[in-house]
């Protein structure tokens, strides 16, 4: 079964029943702030033989998937840009699943693999260029654009906690990286947007936003461990899940956190509820996916992706 979604000027409703929707859509504070043309995406309901790895997209903010040779046991240890890299077995061989930072320059790159005997091998690959759209938002709370000195001190403390969560590494890997959509709602802001708040440039959008009513349940897209919860200046009430081998997801702006640090959650288990905490223009869930400490597009973890 296929579902066609074409961008008009309104957000689209996406059901969790089709797993995570591959979306190139964005509704900023108002749809007039961003203009997208020529986008048409097809979502295909996954079959029993669906791809277990994320979709390869070797662009800044994307994912490179590199087959490794020789096929030895145990799995080789792989590094890229000083970070340990996820290695999964797929199609009968080891594959390096590499998260590419949004700040990465297009061009040649290399990962290095080391086998159990200490022998190393380099795997070159190319990062393609990608231009992300611009988003302009207007915030009524000026502190969210120009924080006070006290706010800045708090933000600095919180950034240390957030970075520590994103740097988490556990050896255990999930057998499948196919996601569930964390919440029923409308994709209102896509990944990678170059953001301006009240005409002031800010960091690119490091996840996707899903607009939904306050109190709408949020579920774990994959099984994992709760490695951090808290309430942060910009992010509001937040949950971090560690899914193994450098794959970490973050859920922001909650009204309620339904899990405790240290808990193990299954795929589809409720972890919180949609809210308006932190820096927001309306109720929504901000969902970030981090792979080897690089923020990557969450839609690459969806069952199928076809661009037209």
Indicate residue ranges for each PLM-predicted region.
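Tryptophan (W) side chains
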Residues: 4-7
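Short, low-complexity intrinsically disordered segments enriched in A/P/G/S/L with frequent Arg
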Residues: 11, 15-31
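Bacterial N-terminal signal peptides
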Residues: 33-44
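Cationic-aromatic interfacial patches
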Residues: 49-124, 129-131
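Surface-exposed, glycine-biased beta-strand/turn segments
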Residues: 53, 124-235
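Catalytic cores of peptidoglycan-degrading enzymes
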Residues: 180-308
């Amino acid at each position: 079964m296929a579902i066609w979604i074409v961008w008009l000027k309104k957000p689209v409703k996406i059901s969790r029943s089709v797993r995570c929707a591959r979306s190139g859509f964005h509704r900023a504070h108002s749809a007039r702030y961003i203009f997208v043309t020529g986008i048409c995406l097809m979502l295909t309901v996954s079959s029993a033989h669906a791809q277990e790895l994320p979709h390869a997209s070797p662009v800044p903010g994307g994912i490179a998937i590199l087959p490794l040779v020789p096929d030895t046991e145990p799995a080789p240890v792989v590094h890229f840009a000083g970070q340990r890299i996820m290695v999964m077995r797929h199609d009968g061989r080891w594959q390096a699943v590499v998260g590419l930072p949004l700040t990465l320059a297009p061009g040649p790159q290399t990962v290095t693999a080391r086998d159990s005997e200490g022998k190393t091998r380099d795997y070159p690959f190319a990062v393609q260029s990608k231009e992300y759209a611009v988003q302009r938002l207007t915030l009524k709370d000026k502190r969210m654009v120009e924080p006070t000195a006290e706010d800045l001190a708090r933000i600095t403390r919180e950034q240390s906690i957030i970075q520590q969560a994103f740097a988490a590494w556990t050896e255990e890997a999930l057998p499948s990286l196919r996601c569930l959509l964390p919440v029923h709602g409308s994709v209102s802001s896509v990944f990678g947007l170059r953001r301006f708040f009240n005409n002031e440039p800010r960091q690119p959008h490091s996840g996707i936003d899903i607009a939904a009513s306050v109190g709408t349940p949020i579920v774990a897209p994959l099984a994992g461990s709760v490695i951090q919860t808290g309430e942060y200046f910009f992010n509001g009430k937040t949950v971090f899940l560690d899914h193994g081998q450098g794959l970490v997801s973050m859920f922001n702006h909650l009204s309620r956190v339904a899990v405790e640090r240290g808990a193990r959650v299954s795929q589809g288990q409720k972890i919180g509820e949609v809210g308006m905490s932190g820096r927001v223009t309306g109720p929504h869930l901000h969902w970030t996916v981090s792979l080897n400490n690089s923020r990557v597009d969450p839609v690459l973890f969806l069952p199928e992706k076809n661009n037209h």
